[in-house]
């Protein structure tokens, strides 16, 4: 019996470092798809695993993989209040 064909997906992720020094990774294209790691590399490995789990759940529920929105720019802006 053949195993199901796997497909490759590419997603943009956001990595931030919190106050405690942990790296927090989020995939904006997939709701509730986030994780953390003690190192940057661990956060990247963890977000790949979480994205795979999210995609498997979508597939199991017969839902399509969401379109990856094109991010035009990520910037820091200064605001005075």
Each PLM stretch: what is its role?
Residues 3-24, 28:
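N-terminal first-folded block
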Residues 1-12, 45-81:
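Short, charged, surface-exposed hinge/linker loops at domain edges
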Residues 23-57:
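Amphipathic, hydrophobic secondary-structure cores in small proteins
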